Amino acid sequence: MSKVQEILEAVKGLTVLELSELVKAFEEEFGVSAAAPVAVAAAPGAAAAPAAPAAAEEEQTEFDVILTAVGDKKVNVIKVVREITGLGLKEAKDLVDGAPKPVKEKVSKEEAAAIKAKLTEAGATVEVK
């Protein structure tokens, strides 16, 4: 049995918690992030046709942040929308009242995640496309 097969057999016997610890140990030891390899590793298990759209999604560099619902903290959401977009009070209120509407379009993944976090913290429901 080759070393690779031995390691594979050992990994098969691990619990989910142990696998999580193994991933963290790899990240610390080699200074890498397991986020991308996990997404790539999931694609080969899919059928051949759906694998192509999955690859296209991974390569997506621009995202739209959509405000889908306001919740009961409308004033806080308006404040955050103004902060994010630079809109005036009336424009921000109109955007919030007209939900679902895009708050910001064609932003990076990191910026989209930050915007989503701010709006969610303010009480809004947000979708990133």
UniProtKB/Swiss-Prot annotation:
UniProt keywords, alphabetically: Ribonucleoprotein, Ribosomal protein
Keyword Ribosomal protein included in the entry's annotation: yes
BP terms from Gene Ontology: translation
Assigned GO CC terms: cytosolic large ribosomal subunit
Gene3D superfamilies given in the database record: 3.30.1390.10, Single helix bin
Top-rank taxon: Bacteria
CDD domains to which the protein is assigned, alphabetical: Ribosomal_L7_L12
GO molecular function: mRNA binding; structural constituent of ribosome
PANTHER family: 39S RIBOSOMAL PROTEIN L12 (PTHR45987), LARGE RIBOSOMAL SUBUNIT PROTEIN BL12M (PTHR45987:SF4)
Quaternary assembly: Homodimer. Part of the ribosomal stalk of the 50S ribosomal subunit. Forms a multimeric L10(L12)X complex, where L10 forms an elongated spine to which 2 to 4 L12 dimers bind in a sequential fashion. Binds GTP-bound translation factors.
Family membership: Belongs to the bacterial ribosomal protein bL12 family.
Summary of the function given for this chain in its UniProt record: Forms part of the ribosomal stalk which helps the ribosome interact with GTP-bound translation factors. Is thus essential for accurate translation.
Protein name: Large ribosomal subunit protein bL12
Organism this protein belongs to: Pelotomaculum thermopropionicum (strain DSM 13744 / JCM 10971 / SI)
Gene label: rplL
